[in-house]
Regions:
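A short, N-terminal "cap"/entry segment at the start of jelly-roll beta-barrel domains
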Residues: 1-50, 136-143
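Ligand-binding loop in jelly-roll beta-barrel domains
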Residues: 103-131
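Short histidine-centered beta-strand/loop micro-motifs
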Residues: 43-45, 63-69, 110-112
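Short acidic-glycine-tyrosine-enriched beta hairpin
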Residues: 88-104
Length: 143
């Protein structure tokens, strides 16, 4: 039986509040300013692609410019408030909100300038790429 049909507690239970943070990277490999991530659980599923969830911590004033991901993902706001930018519009996201973003769909995420605390979101995606992978997102050069 393959590994993705088994449960391994040390690998399949991860605390995204206490695990170590990692720098998140631009597609060219440079660290994103003011943004870190905490890896959560991930596993290869039947289709051979990886599923996973990570915590992203955005310091006040930081932003992800317009970008896409290879797969669809769901964002869950854990703390504070921010905005998701879709089709030229900023939509506010507050604690408890869940947002679905289709695969290859251009979007941006930024903090709320009126909120002086870190904006924390849970990003759950398929396929999943490691939090510190420079291939996690592709920047969109035009809107």
């Amino acid at each position: 039986m393959s590994h993705h049909h088994e449960f391994h507690a040390t690998r399949h239970i991860q605390n995204i509040l206490t695990n170590s943070t990692l720098k998140m990277l631009e597609p060219d490999g440079t660290p994103l300013n003011g943004i870190e991530g905490v890896p959560g659980v991930s596993e290869i599923i039947d289709s051979g692609i990886e599923i996973g969830a990570d915590r992203i911590i955005m310091q006040p004033g930081s932003a992800f410019e317009l970008h896409t991901h290879p797969g669809a993902h769901i964002l869950y706001v854990m703390r504070a408030a921010g905005f998701i930018h879709v089709d030229g519009v900023d939509y506010e996201m507050t604690e408890g909100d869940t947002v679905y973003v289709p695969a290859q769909f251009a979007h941006g995420v930024k903090t709320n300038p009126e909120v002086d605390e870190a904006f924390e979101i849970l990003s759950f995606g398929v396929p999943h790429l490691p939090i510190d992978s420079s291939e996690r997102m592709s920047v969109v050069t035009h809107s």
